[in-house]
Regions:
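Accessory cap/linker subdomain of secreted extracellular hydrolases
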Residues: 1-123, 128-136, 143-147, 176, ...
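Extracellular/periplasmic catalytic domains that process cell-envelope and extracellular macromolecules
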Residues: 115-117, 168-172, 189
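Generic hydrophobic/packing signal
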Residues: 120, 165-170, 182-183, 268-269
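Histidine-bearing beta->alpha loop at or near hydrolase active sites
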Residues: 129, 160-164, 181-186
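Short, glycine/charged-enriched secondary-structure capping and boundary segments
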Residues: 137-140, 193
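Short mixed-charge
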Residues: 146-173, 223-228, 232
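Post-His helix in hydrolase/transferase enzymes
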Residues: 189-200
Length: 283
């Protein structure tokens, strides 16, 4: 995997070529190569779910029962929805894939810098069991934004209403990066209380760490330069989780299977990117 990522002409070099050329075919080829040879490695060889490396594939979480809830007439009327909710759309995915969207930076960091300079609250966060959008990469992106004072801020524990530390945050002014503990890709599913309180604090202009301070210029968290917490393997699964299992957000792992449960969760499998193809990089 290291060679696939950093080897000559491989993922990193292809990504740089995508940035330099901006061509759809170059970026799509790079996107496909990186996905099939770096992103999917855990799925292929370790049989782990790249969206939650604690789980073996197929991983039944997050459960898909919420789709029926969101498509109920009562909910749609309450939120003013005019179309049905779909968890994913292959047509949209194909459209993004054809341009190599995943491999493009496309001014994302510059856009974040603009938000920061406009004094807009920005919270970047990631679940630390997510390999696909891993927190280490998120931390690097947060540093690239170069928000005033952020490089000198430190990580501190996030206090939530259940008095359990579910995360650590590094914040300077209205810009913050949050590492969510024991969480896969869809953080609100795995850590619902932490997600809700983080969101509530952000939109109300409060500090992410406690929710008690109104954030003003000069506010900065103090603590270690890196988030070094290690949670061990207590929630790692060594057998494929039953499709009928439910997830316990207190113990941060699947509940034991009850014989009374009869519902069946969908067996989800994220598809590979299209097969690699030869691209002329000289034209």
């Amino acid at each position: 995997m290291y060679n696939a990522l950093y080897g000559p002409g491989n993922c990193v070099d292809m990504t740089k070529e995508c940035y330099a050329s901006g061509r759809n075919d170059v970026c799509s080829f790079a996107d496909n190569f990186c996905a099939n040879n770096v992103e999917e490695v855990l799925d292929i060889y370790a049989l782990r779910d790249e969206y939650d490396i604690r789980e073996l594939s197929p991983d039944p979480f997050p459960s898909t029962f919420y789709v029926d809830y969101l498509n109920s007439p009562t909910v749609q009327e309450a939120i003013g929805a005019y179309v049905n909710f779909s968890e994913s759309n292959s047509a949209v995915s194909s459209a993004f894939g054809s341009t190599g969207d995943d491999d493009r930076e496309s001014g994302t960091i510059e856009a974040l810098k603009t938000l920061v300079s406009d004094d807009i609250t920005v919270v970047l966060y990631a679940g630390d069991a997510d390999y696909n959008c891993n927190w280490l990469g998120g931390e690097v992106v947060a540093g690239e934004v170069n928000a005033p004072g952020f490089s000198n801020a430190g990580y501190t524990n996030v206090t939530s209403s259940d008095n359990i530390v579910h995360a650590q945050v590094k914040q300077s002014g209205k810009f913050s990066f949050v590492r969510i503990f024991e969480s896969g890709h869809e953080v609100p599913f795995y850590q619902p209380l932490m997600s809700l309180e983080m969101f509530d604090r952000a939109i109300n202009g409060k500090d992410i760490a406690t929710g008690r301070r109104t954030v003003k210029s000069g506010y900065k968290t103090t603590g270690s330069a890196k988030s070094t917490y290690r949670e061990g393997n207590s929630t790692v699964q060594f057998e494929v989780v039953n499709a009928t299992a439910t997830y316990n957000t207190t113990s941060n792992e699947p509940d034991p299977i009850s014989a009374k449960k009869s519902f069946k969760a969908a067996n989800k499998r994220r598809l590979f990117k299209p097969a690699k193809r030869v691209v002329d990089l000289t034209s």
